[in-house]
Amino acid sequence: MASHIVGYPRMGPKRELKFALESFWDGKSSAEDLEKVATDLRASIWKQMADAGIKYIPSNTFSYYDQVLDTTAMLGAVPERYSWTGGEIGFSTYFSMARGNATVPAMEMTKWFDTNYHFIVPELGPNTKFSYSSHKAVNEYKEAKALGVDTVPVLVGPVSYLLLSKPAKGVEKSFALLSLLSSILPVYKEVIAELKAAGATWIQFDEPTLVLDLDSHQLAAFSAAYTELESALSGLNVLIETYFADIPAESYKTLTSLNSVTAYGFDLIRGSKTLDLVKSAGFPSGKYLFAGVVDGRNIWADDLAASLTTLESLEAIVGKDKLVVSTSCSLMHTAVDLVNETKLDSEIKSWLAFAAQKVVEVNALAKALAGQKDEAYFAANTAAQASRRSSPRVTNEEVQKAAAALRGSDHRRATNVSARLDAQQKKLNLPVLPTTTIGSFPQTVELRRVRREYKAKKISEDEYVSAIKEEISKVVKIQEELDIDVLVHGEPERNDMVEYFGEQLSGFAFTANGWVQSYGSRCVKPPIIYGDVSRPNAMTVFWSKMAQSMTSRPMKGMLTGPVTILNWSFVRNDQPRFETCYQIALAIKKEVEDLEAGGIQVIQIDEAALREGLPLRKAEHAFYLDWAVHSFRITNCGVQDTTQIHTHMCYSNFNDIIHSIINMDADVITIENSRSDEKLLSVFREGVKYGAGIGPGVYDIHSPRIPSTEEIADRINKMLAVLDTNILWVNPDCGLKTRKYTEVKPALTNMVLAAKLIRTQLASAK
C-alpha cells in the first residue's frame, strides 16, 4: 500500500527561507548564500519523507516565491516591462516580476483559491512568446536523485495555468486565454522529455481548477491538452492532482476519460461528496486513486480510524494495489513541525499535527491498509481524539445555549439606516465629507520594543500602560492638528488584528512557530480555535475610553469582526464553521455593548476577510454569505440609533457581493479601493441603491508615494459623480501601521485639504 504527499511547506521549521530571502533582497548576502539555504531545506524535506516511508515524494514544490511564478519562468512568459532578453531566468528577473524594482511595478498578486496563500498572476496575450526558460523542475528532480531519493516532479498543469492567468495590459479583457494552449504545450513537452531522460517514472500535474464551475469549452481544454501531450507522456505514470473542493460530476467524467492519465488525486476533506461520486459514477479500471484523507489545510491530528474506514471503502472499488494514501492538498497551507512548540499546553498539543506529523500519519494509514498497523500509534491517536471530544476546556454550555438561541432571528437594528444616520448626525455634528482614518498608525521600532518587553515581563504593567498612553496621546494630537473629524487611537497596543483579540478570548490557543506562507517571504501565524469561544473580560474598552478622554472629537472604538477572526485562524473541525462564527459574534457583541456604555459613539468592526471565505462554487455562495452577514449583524444589533457602526473591507473586487454588503446594515463602510477605482464605482454607476455612509479609500497606503491634494480632490469628485454628497466619507484605503510618519503626515494633510477644498466648492455651488 503506497503513500504520497501533494506538496510541503518551503519556509523551513524556523522560517529559514524567509530570513535568507530578506537578507538577499537587502543586499546583505549573496545569491550563493540564498541557494545554499534552499538546497539544505530541500534535502532535509526529501530525507524526512523518505525516512517516514513515503513512496511518492514530490519535487519542484519548493519555490523561492511562488509555484505559479515558477511556471511563468519555465514558459518564458516574462512581461515586456522587465526587459528580459532571453536565456535562463535568474533571480534578478524572477524577483522583479514578484516584487517590482526601482523602475517597474510587480505583477499582480491574488489569492490562491480560498486559501490565505497568494500567487503571482501571469499576464498573457496573443503576442506572448513562450520558450523553455527555467529548468528548475528537472534540476530539482536530479538534485533529489543525487541524494538517493526518487521523486515525483510536480508541475502546475497547463490548463489551470491559463485559467488562472489574466490578459496583459493593453490586451482586450475578452481575450481567450485558453487559445494559448497550443503555444505552451511545446514547452511542457520539452520539460517532460528532460524529466524522462533524467529517469523520472511518475509526473504530477496540479490541475486544481477542475474543482471550479467550468463550462464545456473549459472542460474540452483538459481533453485537448492531455491528448496533445499523450505521446510525450508515454512510458510515464501521470497523476492529475485536484484539491480544495469536490470535483463536479462533469469534470470527473472528463478527467477519468483522459487516456494519457494513470492516476487521479482528490481532496476527500473539503470534497466530502467526491467519495459518493466515485461510488456512483464508477472508477476506471487499472487506474490509481490518490485519496486525500489527511487534511493539508488545518492543524488537527487526523482521526485515523475514520480515515481507515474511508480508505477501506475505496479499496473495494479501486483495488488494493491501485489505492494511494495522500494529503488533501499541499501541506504548505499548514504549519511546519509541532516539535518546535515547547510552550503549548500538552493536552491541546496532543490534538494537533503539523506538516511533519501529517507525513507520518499518511504513512501509518498506508501501512495499516497493507496489514501492518502500528497498534500503539493508532491507540494513542484514538485516545487523543477521545480526549478532544470530552475535554471540559472544549465545551462551554452557556456559550452553546446562547449560540443556539440565535437561530430564528435575523438580528437587525430596529430603525432603518437613513433614520439612524440622522440621529447620529444630530449627536456627532460632522461636516459634509467627514474625514477619518482606518485605525492603525505607524508602529515604530520603539513601540514594538515596549510590547515585546512587556510580554517578556521585562517592564511592569504601569510602565507599559504609561508608554502606550503616551503613544495614544501623540496620535490623538497629530489627528487634531491635521483637523481630522473622527479620530482613532492608533492601536499601539496591538501586534495583529486577529491575535490581539484571540489572546483575550477563551477557546483560542497560540503557537510559537506555527507560521504559514502568505506570499513570498511573508508568513502569518494563525491562532488555533480549539473550543467554544467566549469573552471573559472587556478587551479594548480601557484604551478606547482613555483615548476618548483626550479629545472632544468622536473617537472610534476598533474591533475585528467575527468572520475575519474565523477566516484568519485554524478553526476547530468538530462543528460547522458558522457555529464557531456565531460564538465569536456573541463575544464581539459584548465588547460593542461595553464600548457604547463607556461613552464611545462610533465603533468600527473590521471585516477585512469577509470575501475571502467565499466558497469556490457559486451554488454554495448564498449559504456562506447568509451566515457571514448575519454574524456581523449579531455584533451590533443591540446598540442605540445614535451609536454609529462602521465596518472596513480590505479587497477591491466585491461587485458580486454588493447586496450582501448592503445587507450587513452598517452605518458607514470604508473600503480599500484606490487601486481599483473604476471597479468599485461601476457598481454604483450601474444603479445599485446605497443609502449608508461610504468611504472608498482616496489613496493607496501600500505605497510610500505621497498623493497630492489635487489628485485626492480629483478622486473625491469622481466618487461624487456616482455617490450622494451626504453619504461620502474621506479616508485612506487601509490602516497606516506599515507606513512611516514621514509618509503618513503629508498624505493625511493633503487628504484633509482635499476634503476642505471640495466642501468649499460644494458650498459655493449652492
Swiss-Prot record:
Gene3D superfamilies: 3.20.20.210. One of its GO terms (cellular component) is cytosol. Keywords: Amino-acid biosynthesis, Cytoplasm, Metal-binding, Methionine biosynthesis, Methyltransferase, Transferase, Zinc. It catalyses: 5-methyltetrahydropteroyltri-L-glutamate + L-homocysteine = tetrahydropteroyltri-L-glutamate + L-methionine. Its cofactor is Zn(2+). One of its GO terms (biological process) is methylation. The active site is at H702 (proton donor). InterPro entries: Cbl-indep_Met_Synth_N, Cobalamin-indep_Met_synthase, Met_Synth_C/arc, UROD/MetE-like_sf. 5-methyltetrahydropteroyltri-L-glutamate binds at K18, N116, D496, Y519, R522, C523, W568. Binds 2 Zn(2+) ions per subunit. Pathway: Amino-acid biosynthesis; L-methionine biosynthesis via de novo pathway; L-methionine from L-homocysteine (MetE route): step 1/1. Zn(2+) 2 binds at H659. It is found in: Cytoplasm, Cytosol. L-methionine binds at I438, G439, S440, E491, D606. It is an enzyme of class 2 (transferase). Zn(2+) 1 binds at H648, C650, E672, C734. It comes from the Eukaryota. Catalyzes the transfer of a methyl group from 5-methyltetrahydrofolate to homocysteine resulting in methionine formation. HAMAP family: Meth_synth (MF_00172). NCBIfam families: met_syn_B12ind, PRK05222.1. This is 5-methyltetrahydropteroyltriglutamate--homocysteine methyltransferase 2. It comes from Oryza sativa subsp. japonica (Rice).
